[in-house]
Structures are given as C-alpha cells and as structure tokens.
C-alpha cells in the first residue's frame, strides 16, 4: 500500500488521477483543504493548525502537534508513514507556494524518506520529482 501526504500548497483536480482506491491519506494542516479538489477523505489529519483551523470530522483520526517543534507537519507525516510500514509515499501540495523554504524542506523530507528505504515522489501539475539512490 501507498501513503499519500497532502501538504498545504493548493492542488488542481487534475491530480486526482494520481490517487488509487487503496491509498492511505494523511492531510497536513491546511493540506486538508486539498481533499475537496481531489475528491478524497483523509485517514489521518495532523498538524499544529497554525495555517488552518483544526477540522471537525467524525471518524477521522486527528493528531494535534505542538506549535513549537523542530520538524514541519509534512516531515512528521512522512515519519509516521515510515513508522506505519509504507514503502511508497506520494507528496502532493508539497511544491510551490509562497514560501520557498517549505518547498526546500519538503524536498529534504522526500530525501529522508528515501534514506529510510521508502520510495518518495513529490508531484504537482508541472513537475514530478523522484530520488535516485546509489546503485540504481
């Protein structure tokens, strides 16, 4: 099974084609807003909810993170996906946006997943980023 992490950069409905029926979806903070255009429901919502209010949904697992922390919400979600044993992670809403440091951090998150043996892909409407490991 694959984990899809939805970060906060807005995504277009055309990315819905990337989703699979058995994907496990983690929405990070304002990334929850990306569920509507993608037509999906998250399995877990997590974040410090500094950029969007904590959604109130029945039957959703919600993990509230502290406001002061060393990792981004997306990094926390990636670590959670790795701990749950996913071998593939697709990050949507992780490229672009108003803050370049978030894009750079998300690239580092993808690399961190790869270093833990998890195949990572960051994708938006214009770009698809994967990582080539030594020996491939």
What are these regions (language model features)?
Residues 62-84:
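Short phosphate-binding loop-to-helix
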Residues 1-55:
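N-terminal beta-strand-loop-alpha-helix module at the start
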Residues 22-23, 42, 59-60, 86, ...:
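Short, well-ordered alpha-helix to beta-strand connector turns
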Residues 111-136:
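Class I SAM-dependent methyltransferase SAM-binding "motif I" and its flanking Rossmann-like core
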Residues 100-111:
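Short Gly/Thr/Asp-enriched flexible loops that form oxyanion-binding sites at enzyme active sites
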Residues 94-101, 128-133:
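Internal, active-site/partner-interface "lid" segment
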Residues 6, 26-29, 47, 63-64, ...:
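General beta-strand structural signal in soluble alpha/beta enzymes
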């Amino acid at each position: 099974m694959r984990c899809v992490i939805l970060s906060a950069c807005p995504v277009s409905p055309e990315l819905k084609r990337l989703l699979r029926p058995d994907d496990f979806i983690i929405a990070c903070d304002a990334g929850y807003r990306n569920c509507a255009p993608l037509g999906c429901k998250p399995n877990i919502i997590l974040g410090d909810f500094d950029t969007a209010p904590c959604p109130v949904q029945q039957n959703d697992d919600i993990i509230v993170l502290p406001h002061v922390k060393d990792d981004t919400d997306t990094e926390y979600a990636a670590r959670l996906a790795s701990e749950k044993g996913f071998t593939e992670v697709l990050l949507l809403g992780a490229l672009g946006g108003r803050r370049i440091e978030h894009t750079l951090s998300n690239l580092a998150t993808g690399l961190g997943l790869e270093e833990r043996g998890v195949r990572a892909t960051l994708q938006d409407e214009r770009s698809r980023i994967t990582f080539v490991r030594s020996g491939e």
